[in-house]
C-alpha cells in the first residue's frame, strides 16, 4: 500500500444529494446552521439578537415588512378582521434615540385621505377584512408608504358623475348683412311637427294714391322715398314720384292757370315677412296700405309668395330684418336685441335669452334644439360642434360641448367654457350662472362616471414622524386620493380594465404604479401614482396610463412581477411574460408584453431578485423546486436553471416564504410553522458563478415570518402562544454581539440565539446553592432549547479573567439560574444551537478534464484527518464507523504548549487532527459546535493507505 495524502480545499459548495463519489470537492451531505462563504470558508451561522416580544392578533395573519431608511425599519401584521399591528425592529424616537422591539400605534381615521366612513364594526379598515389565506393580501412599500391589496375585493366605480348637460345653446353672429332676418327655429327634439309660413316674393302697388295735409298745386310736396315696415316683418320701399300737370279748368286764362300734382308710386320689396300671400285667408295677409310721412297713402298687394316649412314647435324667432339703407349702421347689439325681444315676446317657451358680447345664449329647463335658415349669418352651438373653430369666445361659464371632428367616435372630445376670473368646478350650474369672455378647456363627457370607489381599492399605511404625543411615531391607515377622470368618455378615455375585476398585485415600475388584474396589466400615469386616466382625449401621450392584455392559449391570471434590467417580468401560474418597450420612451404607444417561457409558478409565493437574475418557486410534485431565470432579454426565451436540483428530495413542498439579500447573495426559504429554514448562497465573478450552495438553519422556534433588511435577517418565531422578533446579522454590524479580549486584536461573533445582555447589577449569587440567577427576562419562550450564559466582555469593571466563561442555564420558577458566581461582569443570556457538518465519503480524487473523478474501486484506509479551521473555539468531531462504536472527541482551539493566562479559547486559525484508522467506505465524518464560540471550516487534509487492488486502470 502507498501512503497518500490529499486536500479538500474548501467545504463551501453546500449540500448535495448526489452519490458521494459524484460529489464535487467542497460539497457535503448535510449542513446545518452554517453559511458557506467563498472568502471565509464554512462559517457558523450568526446567533440571533433578541429584538422584542410581541403579541400579534389572533387567527390567520398576513405579515409584511416596511423599510423607510437605515434607521427606521418595521414589521407589521394584518388580521382577517382588518386590524393592523406594527413593531419597530429599528427606529429612532422623538429624541433621536434608537429603539427596537417596540409596538407602534396604528390609527384608522385620522390624517389626509382618512378612511373615515369605511371602518368595519371593529373600527378597522373594511377593505382589509374578509380574507382567509395570507397570499390573498399583497403588500408594496414605496418610500414611506406601504400599500395593502386585498385580492378578494372587486374594484368598482362610485355613483359620482360629471355634471349633466345643461339644456342650452349659444348663437354667435358671423356677419352683419343688410336686409337680412336673423331668424331662429327652436323646437322640441322629440317632435317632428312642422310649421308653415308664407313669404312674399313680389309686390304690386296701386297707381291710385290719396293724400292729405298737402297742397295740390303742382308743388309735388308728397313725392319721395320711404321704407315701410309692415306687419309680420314685411318691408318694402315706396318711391312716390310726382309730375305737375295743368289744370284743364284754368287753361282758358293764361294769367290764371293752375297746376295739379300727378303722383306715380313704385314699390321695391326688401323683405317678404311672414304669412304674406296672394290670397288672404285666416292669419295670412295680402294687402297693406301706408300713409307716408308726407301724407301720401299707397296700397301694395302681394303678387307672388313662397311657402316655407320649418321645425319650430317651441318658438319661431322672427326679428325684423336688418336695414338696407346705407346711412343706417347695422350693429351686433341691435341684431341680438331684436332677436331677444322677438323671443321674449313669445309666451310659454320656457327659454331664457342672455346677450353676451356678440352672442345670444339660450337656456331651457328641458331639452330643445335650435337652428337657423340663415346659416351664413350666424353659427349655433348646442351640445355638439364640428370643430374647435366653431366655438365662441364668450359663453356661459361651465357650458360643455362635444367636438365631433369626424364620423369616428375615437376622435371625439369634450370642452368646457371657463369664463375669466372663474374656476372650473364652481358656479357651473344654471342657478349660479356666470357669463363672460374666457377659454375652452378639456373636460369629461357630461353625466359620466368619473370616480373610482376608494372603498374597493388599496389602502396605504403611512408613517407619522415621532412627536411628543407619539414618541416613536405612529402609522396612519389611509385611502389614497384617487384622481378622477377629467377628460373624454368611455371610448377616448376608458375605465381601467381592473374596474369590475379583482387586483392581484401592486408593483412599481418606471415611476408608475402597476396593477395586475386578471390577465391585464394596468399602470398609472407617469409620476402620478393615483391617476389611471389619460390627461387628454385629443391625443395619446407617453405619460398616459398603459392597459395591456397578456394573450395566451392558457388561462392567464397575472399574480406577481419583478423588475429586471430589460423590463418587468410577469408571473402567472403557468407562464411568464415581460412588459418592455423597444423605444427610448415608455408609454401606451410603445409598451408591449412579450411571452417569455412556460414554467409552473406557485402564486402563493413571491418571486425574488437575485441581483441581475430572478428566482421563483414551483410547488408541483412531492417537493418544491427553485428556478433561476437568467439571460432575460426582450426577444427570445430566457435561460431557466433549476437551482434546487442538488436537494430535489430535501426541498420541502410547503415552502411559501422566500426572502433574499442581494448584497449578501443569499436567498432564504421558509415554511410557516416550521423551525427549519433553507438557504441558497451564490456568488458570481464576471460571467462565472463561482459559488452556489445549499444549507439549512434550525431556528429556536417555529417560523411565522422572515425578511432581510439592511444585512439583517429578521424572523418572527413562535413557541406555544408566545412570539419573538429576532435578528441575525448576516454581515457584522456595529451593534453585533461580539467577544474580544484585551490580549488579542481579534473580534469574534457570539453564537447564541435570542441573545440579550444581562447587566451585572441584575445578577445575584447564592452561596448556599452556589448558583447565580437573574429574573427571567421577556422573550425567554423556547421550550426544548438549552439556555446558556456567556461572558463576552470585561465590562463594567474591566474584569478580564471571566471573558469567555460559559455555563448552561435553566429556568427555576421566575428566575434563570446557572452554576458559579457571575456577579463581576455583564453577560449574555441566550439559547445554544448546533453547527453541524456531515462530510461525504472520502475518495482519492483526480481531475479528468474539467471534472473530478473519484476512485471507488481502490482500497483506501483513512489514517488521520487534519481539519483546518478559521475562527474556531470549542469544536467536536464524531466518526461513525460500521460495526464499531462512534468515536467522538471535543477540542479547544488552544496551543497547550504556548498558552497565555486568561487567553480566550478561540483561535483565528487552528488545525485539529483527528485519528481515524478506518476504511473510507466504513467511515462517516461529522463536525459539530454547540458552544457560543465561532466555528469556521476552511479545508481538510486526509492521510491514508491507498492500494489500487492490482487492477490496471483503463
Regions found by a protein language model. Give the residues of each.
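Short linear interaction motifs
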Residues: 56-60, 114-137, 165, 481-504, ...
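Long, charge-dense tracts
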Residues: 138, 145, 165-175, 252-257, ...
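Beta-sheet repeat architectures centered on beta-propellers
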Residues: 2-71, 622-624, 628-954
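Extracellular Cys-Trp
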Residues: 208-213, 222-237, 440
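Hydrophobic/aromatic beta-strand positions that recur at structurally equivalent sites within the blades
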Residues: 66, 87-92, 149, 158, ...
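Hydrophobic or amphipathic alpha-helical targeting/insertion segments
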Residues: 93-95, 100, 105, 122-181, ...
Amino acid at each position: 500500500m502507498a501512503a497518500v495524502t490529499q486536500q479538500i480545499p474548501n467545504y463551501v459548495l453546500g449540500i448535495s444529494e448526489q452519490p458521494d463519489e459524484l460529489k464535487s470537492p467542497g460539497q457535503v451531505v448535510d449542513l446545518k446552521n452554517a453559511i458557506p462563504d467563498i472568502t471565509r470558508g464554512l462559517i457558523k451561522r450568526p446567533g440571533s439578537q433578541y429584538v422584542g416580544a410581541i403579541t400579534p392578533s389572533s387567527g390567520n395573519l398576513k405579515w409584511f415588512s416596511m423599510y423607510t431608511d437605515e434607521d427606521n425599519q418595521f414589521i407589521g401584521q394584518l388580521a382577517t378582521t382588518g386590524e393592523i399591528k406594527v413593531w419597530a425592529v429599528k427606529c429612532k424616537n422623538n429624541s433621536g434615540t434608537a429603539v427596537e422591539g417596540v409596538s407602534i400605534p396604528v390609527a384608522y381615521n385620522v390624517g389626509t385621505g382618512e378612511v373615515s366612513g369605511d371602518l368595519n364594526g371593529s373600527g378597522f379598515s373594511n377593505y382589509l377584512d374578509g380574507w382567509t389565506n395570507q397570499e390573498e393580501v399583497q403588500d408594496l412599500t414605496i418610500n414611506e408608504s406601504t400599500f395593502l391589496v386585498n385580492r378578494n375585493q372587486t374594484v368598482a366605480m362610485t355613483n359620482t358623475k360629471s355634471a349633466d348637460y345643461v339644456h342650452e345653446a349659444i348663437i354667435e353672429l358671423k356677419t352683419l348683412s343688410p336686409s337680412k332676418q336673423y331668424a331662429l327655429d327652436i323646437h322640441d327634439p322629440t317632435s317632428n311637427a312642422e310649421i308653415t309660413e308664407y313669404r312674399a316674393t313680389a309686390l304690386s302697388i296701386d297707381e291710385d294714391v290719396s293724400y292729405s295735409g298737402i297742397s295740390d298745386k303742382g308743388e309735388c310736396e308728397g313725392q319721395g322715398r320711404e321704407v315701410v315696415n309692415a306687419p309680420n316683418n314685411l318691408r318694402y320701399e315706396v318711391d312716390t314720384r310726382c309730375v305737375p300737370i295743368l289744370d284743364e279748368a284754368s287753361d282758358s286764362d293764361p294769367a290764371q292757370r293752375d297746376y295739379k300734382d300727378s303722383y306715380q308710386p313704385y314699390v321695391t320689396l326688401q323683405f317678404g315677412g311672414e304669412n304674406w300671400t296672394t290670397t288672404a285667408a285666416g292669419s295670412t295677409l295680402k294687402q297693406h296700405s301706408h300713409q307716408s310721412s308726407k301724407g301720401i297713402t299707397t296700397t301694395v298687394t302681394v303678387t307672388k309668395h313662397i311657402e316655407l316649412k320649418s321645425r319650430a314647435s317651441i318658438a319661431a324667432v322672427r326679428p325684423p330684418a336688418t336695414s338696407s339703407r346705407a346711412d343706417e349702421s347695422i350693429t351686433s347689439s341691435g341684431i341680438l336685441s331684436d332677436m331677444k325681444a322677438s323671443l321674449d315676446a313669445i309666451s310659454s317657451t320656457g327659454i331664457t335669452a342672455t346677450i353676451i358680447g356678440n352672442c345670444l345664449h339660450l337656456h331651457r329647463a328641458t331639452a330643445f334644439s335650435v337652428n337657423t335658415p340663415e346659416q351664413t349669418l350666424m353659427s349655433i352651438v348646442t351640445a355638439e360642434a364640428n370643430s374647435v373653430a366653431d366655438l365662441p369666445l364668450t359663453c356661459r361659464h361651465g357650458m360643455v360641448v362635444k367636438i365631433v371632428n369626424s364620423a369616428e367616435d375615437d376622435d371625439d372630445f369634450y370642452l368646457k367654457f371657463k369664463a375669466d376670473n372663474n374656476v372650473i368646478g364652481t358656479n357651473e350650474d344654471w342657478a349660479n350662472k356666470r357669463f363672460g369672455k374666457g377659454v375652452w378647456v378639456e373636460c369629461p363627457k357630461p353625466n359620466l362616471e368619473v370616480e373610482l370607489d376608494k372603498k374597493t381599492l388599496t389602502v396605504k399605511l403611512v408613517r407619522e414622524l415621532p412627536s411628543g404625543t407619539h414618541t416613536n411615531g405612529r402609522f396612519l391607515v389611509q385611502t389614497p386620493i384617487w384622481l378622477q377622470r377629467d377628460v373624454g368618455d368611455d371610448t377616448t378615455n376608458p375605465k381601467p380594465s381592473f374596474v369590475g375585476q379583482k387586483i392581484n398585485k401592486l408593483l412599481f415600475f418606471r415611476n408608475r404604479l402597476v396593477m395586475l388584474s386578471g390577465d391585464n396589466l394596468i399602470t398609472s400615469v407617469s409620476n402620478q401614482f393615483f391617476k389611471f386616466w389619460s390627461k387628454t382625449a385629443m391625443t395619446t401621450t407617453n405619460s398616459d396610463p398603459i392597459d395591456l392584455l397578456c394573450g395566451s392559449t392558457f388561462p392567464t391570471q397575472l399574480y406577481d412581477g419583478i423588475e429586471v434590467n430589460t423590463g418587468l417580468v410577469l408571473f402567472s401560474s403557468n407562464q411568464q411574460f415581460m412588459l418592455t418597450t423597444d423605444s427610448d420612451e415608455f408609454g401606451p404607444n410603445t409598451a408591449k408584453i412579450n411571452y417569455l417561457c412556460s414554467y409552473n409558478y406557485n402564486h402563493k409565493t413571491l418571486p425574488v431578485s437575485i441581483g441581475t437574475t430572478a428566482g421563483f418557486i414551483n410547488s408541483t410534485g412531492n417537493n418544491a423546486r427553485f428556478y433561476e431565470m437568467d439571460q432575460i432579454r426582450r426577444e427570445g426565451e430566457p435561460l431557466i436553471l433549476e437551482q434546487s436540483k442538488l436537494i430535489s428530495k430535501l426541498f420541502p413542498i410547503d415552502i411559501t416564504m422566500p426572502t433574499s439579500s442581494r448584497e449578501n447573495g443569499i436567498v432564504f426559504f421558509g415554511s410557516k410553522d416550521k423551525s427549519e429554514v433553507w438557504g441558497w448562497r451564490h456568488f458570481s465573478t464576471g460571467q462565472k458563478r463561482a459559488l452556489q450552495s445549499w444549507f439549512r438553519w434550525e431556528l429556536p422556534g417555529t417560523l411565522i415570518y422572515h425578511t432581510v433588511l439592511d444585512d439583517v435577517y429578521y424572523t418572527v418565531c413562535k413557541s406555544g402562544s408566545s412570539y419573538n422578533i429576532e435578528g441575525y446579522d448576516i454581515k457584522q454590524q456595529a451593534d453585533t454581539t461580539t467577544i474580544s479580549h484585551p490580549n488579542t486584536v481579534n473580534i469574534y461573533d457570539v453564537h447564541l440565539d435570542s441573545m440579550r445582555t444581562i447587566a451585572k447589577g441584575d445578577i445575584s449569587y447564592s452561596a448556599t446553592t452556589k448558583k447565580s440567577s437573574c429574573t427571567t427576562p421577556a422573550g425567554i419562550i423556547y421550550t426544548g432549547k438549552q439556555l446558556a450564559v456567556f461572558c463576552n466582555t470585561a465590562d463594567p469593571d474591566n474584569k478580564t479573567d471571566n471573558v469567555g466563561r460559559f455555563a448552561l442555564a435553566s429556568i427555576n420558577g421566575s428566575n434563570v439560574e446557572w452554576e458559579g458566581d457571575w456577579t463581576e461582569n455583564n453577560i449574555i443570556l441566550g439559547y445554544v444551537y448546533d453547527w453541524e457538518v456531515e462530510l461525504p465519503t472520502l475518495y482519492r480524487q483526480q481531475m479528468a478534464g474539467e471534472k473530478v473523478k473519484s476512485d471507488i474501486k481502490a482500497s483506501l484506509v483513512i489514517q488521520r484527518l487534519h481539519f483546518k479551521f478559521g475562527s474556531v473555539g470549542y469544536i467536536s468531531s464524531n466518526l461513525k464507523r460500521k460495526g464499531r462504536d462512534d468515536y467522538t472527541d471535543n477540542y479547544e482551539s488552544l496551543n497547550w504548549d504556548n498558552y497565555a493566562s486568561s487567553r480566550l479559547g478561540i483561535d483565528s486559525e487552528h488545525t485539529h487532527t483527528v485519528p481515524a484508522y478506518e476504511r473510507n467506505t466504513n467511515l462517516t465524518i461529522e463536525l459539530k459546535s454547540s458552544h457560543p464560540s465561532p466555528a469556521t471550516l476552511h479545508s481538510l487534509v486526509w492521510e491514508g493507505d491507498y492500494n489500487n487492488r492490482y487492477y490496471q486502470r483503463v
